[in-house]
Amino acid sequence: EIRQSIDCLNLLRDKPNTPRFLQPGGFLLAKTAHTIRISSFLEVLRLEGHGRIARIDELRGALILLVLIYHLLYDITLFFPATAPRLWLLGDAIRPLRAVVPGLFILLCGMCTHLSRNNMRRGLWCALFAGGIRLVSGIVSPACPIRFGILHLLALCLLLWCALHRPLAQMHLPPWAAMVGGGLLFALTYRLEQGYFAGMPLPAALWDREWLLWLGLPCRRLLSADYFPLLPWGGLFWAGCGLGQWLLTPPYIDRLRQSRSPGMARLGRHTLALYLCHQPVWFAGLWLLRAAHG
């Protein structure tokens, strides 16, 4: 199956008007003693009409559903404070998901760099939406705006990936290198915001550098409603890039394309739109409900 995919790519490269991603240099076939990696195998799947990976869409759908539920619970406590004690009994049960859910989203975004034809465009769109969220949150909540949220992080990671993936590809690193390296980076810098690197305290000179807010260094004056700096969360993105390079090729790709929950997969195809729109919808609905009940 891999051999057929390579032959297909080679034939298409020699034809006129060949898409850019199939032109020479548009894909990498690197062979080591034990490894064959085909970074553009998924381009063949797109040409055959199988660009969507059902299991990834289903996981994204489940994750965005958890985000919607969690934010709804939080918003209800804002509009109806008397309900807070009872609601947060349920909220406490899913509180650990505050780290797990965005972490999985970031991991999936790294995986999907191998599925997108234009990651630069994805990164610029994320940057545009992140800027809009920063502006709106500064108006709605000037004391605690979203200064560097998850969309800021994804935009930065995607743009960094666009700049670095070709030089890294020329090094012929196996997928596990990115997975292990990204995982270690995440683990070593997980408490960086609290002032620790690999369990050791950071020097005082690195504290309170607001211009390095995006990096994740500790800042006691930081007030942000949603904060996902490059360290540690960028480590999960790079781990996802390696995981995608491994899983999104045969034989694993065939299993991931099999859908078990079409409804959840449809939900997962619109995660960005749902993420951008759900809070205004919750706020408007709860405001109307509170107004109706006096």
Where are these regions (language model features)?
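Positively charged N-terminal leader segments that act as targeting/secretion signals
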Residues: I2, C8, R13-L28, T32-T35
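Alpha-helical transmembrane segments and their immediate juxtamembrane cytosolic regions
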Residues: P16, L29-G294
